[in-house]
Amino acid sequence: QQLVMASAKALGAPRYTRASTLFLELKDSYVSRKASELQVVESFRKPTLLILDEFQERGETDFEQRTLTAIIDLRYGDQTDTLIIANQTKERFYESAGESIADRLRETGGIIECTWPSFRDRQTDPDAGELTGGCQ
């Protein structure tokens, strides 16, 4: 336990957030003035590992695209790890993420597509069989 705590202190803790929460934090900075937009962006730049979940749930507006591209590009330049989770096919992800983000992810580790059925569906259907599919 002490080793884990020391590692987290030395390396910095990972940060998990949903993509939509990232934009809620940015929008809150305009109203609450607790932090500037730059400070919010920096808070997503700093972690040694940033995990963005539910990537497909964002609005895909120009503002969101530019902001995500800026964050991913800053992290790319800093050589820090970013994991994006999206319930999308690889093709749809490329389309929604845009070339810049997709290229950065391919260059720094790749994109893994998992083809098994939704686990959420299994929770509502107790008679569902085994999960089939895999990751490539």
State each model region's role.
Residues 1:
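Walker A/P-loop nucleotide-binding motif
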Residues 13, 48-49:
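The start of beta-strands in P-loop NTPase/AAA+ ATPase cores
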Residues 19:
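Active-site loop/turn elements of alpha/beta-hydrolase fold enzymes
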Residues 39-48:
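Short basic/glycine-enriched coil/helix segment immediately N-terminal to the Walker B
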